[in-house]
């Protein structure tokens, strides 16, 4: 008789100790498959679409489907020995236990938007656990204003679509998360999560009320069974350091029947510098119903190089109220009624995803996962706590033109963000004025091309230093940047992790380390920038 997954997990400690050392490559697949079969009760022949060795016809398409940075999609990019395309929670449990028994590194990938490929690349022998099939979304509008259980493999577009579908007859609801619809919910939320309602509602994790995670022992834990410390840690500290996130329960938020969006662009000869300078004083302090993203991009106009400044906005209200507000607070913007479009909230989701015809297309477009789609890119991030002078902005614009293709994206905080304690979640940056994303994209492959663009990105990062936070220079976990430090997981693991950990988490790093030490003392869940365990104290002789 086939035993249940639970029974097999209970007896997992009986797995042969001979598997503690990785077997030869020729038997890795067979060893893992047998372990996986034992854990799940499924015969090996039924697992050919779940456990994928490199020889499988499904291996490359599955691996490539959610590699979102083409830098890591080349013939020389490190490849996992196995991809596990989990179809059930039981598959995730078995993956953790069997990977641990074989002494391999496990990378967990939901949407594949990790900017530096940490969720699917390693220089050590590794397996990839692909969560894209675990994307069930269950919305309950009767639960205290609306809630939803969201599988880690669901995309934000799928989340928004399901909320829209379910709330049609219950008033309009939404969820404060990112504007890119193909981002995976698991990584986005566990890293903090933000979007264009951040000033109204705060971070995505501020609306997480429960979660399910597979721990290092293969157990499925919810908020009650994992305890508040671990629940706190996975709400902004990155879930991959502590286990495998299966799903989050989120609380929905009300949005008005009509919202307003606009885009205004100016170049330097059109007094863009005045607009950019004033933006710093308005965007973080205006009505929390208004989110104004600022983007700076070098462009060519009439054969002359310049910088284009774009303000892209969402206002949770009517156009007339928006015009009254910005005519008074931000005349330098020069906003006109014809710049604005009123629409429903779900239409604004599509508009922010670069669908200019959002008022006529159907929301089903949000269900397009757009697999096997990637460009070459590098991202970095900064936080600003004091407005940059006009001279400083002029300097940065000149350096942008020198860099050629590098763009900056300024995201204002304030509003709800400034009302929440910096220790409420691992995300410590709530009191800043705004966040800056450094964004470099290019089209052509090649090592020399990549080196050139990476060097330009890093050079500009050094030019930005005088204008951003210091000691440490803070950065955002979900804008992963391996330039700020890598953990080799040797004897200096804690010290190496502290370098990047303080930049991502500030003083919250200390609590994250304590949680990590308690729940994963052997550091099974590790990557290039994971949370370390506390250093072992030398024994006294």
From Swiss-Prot:
GO CC terms in record: extracellular region; Golgi apparatus; plant-type cell wall; plasma membrane
Signal sequence region: 1-20
Natural source organism: Arabidopsis thaliana (Mouse-ear cress)
MF-aspect GO terms: FAD binding; oxidoreductase activity, acting on the CH-OH group of donors, oxygen as acceptor
Disulfide bonding pattern of the chain: 35-98
Key words of the record: Cell wall, Disulfide bond, FAD, Flavoprotein, Glycoprotein, Nucleotide-binding, Oxidoreductase, Secreted, Signal
InterPro entries reported in the protein's UniProt record: BBE, FAD-bd_PCMH, FAD-bd_PCMH-like_sf, FAD-bd_PCMH_sub1, FAD-bd_PCMH_sub2, Oxid_FAD_bind_N
Annotated protein name in UniProt: Berberine bridge enzyme-like 1
Cross-link annotation 6-(S-cysteinyl)-8alpha-(pros-histidyl)-FAD (His-Cys), location: 113-180
Essential cofactor(s): FAD
Family designation: Belongs to the oxygen-dependent FAD-linked oxidoreductase family.
Entry-listed glycosylation sites: 25, 38, 73, 136, 302, 339, 357
Gene: SEC1A
Manner of cofactor binding, per the entry note: Binds 1 FAD per subunit in a bicovalent manner.
Expression across tissues: Accumulates in cell walls of etiolated hypocotyls.
EC numbers: 1.1.1.-
Compartment(s) of residence: Secreted, Cell wall
Segments forming domain FAD-binding PCMH-type: 76-255
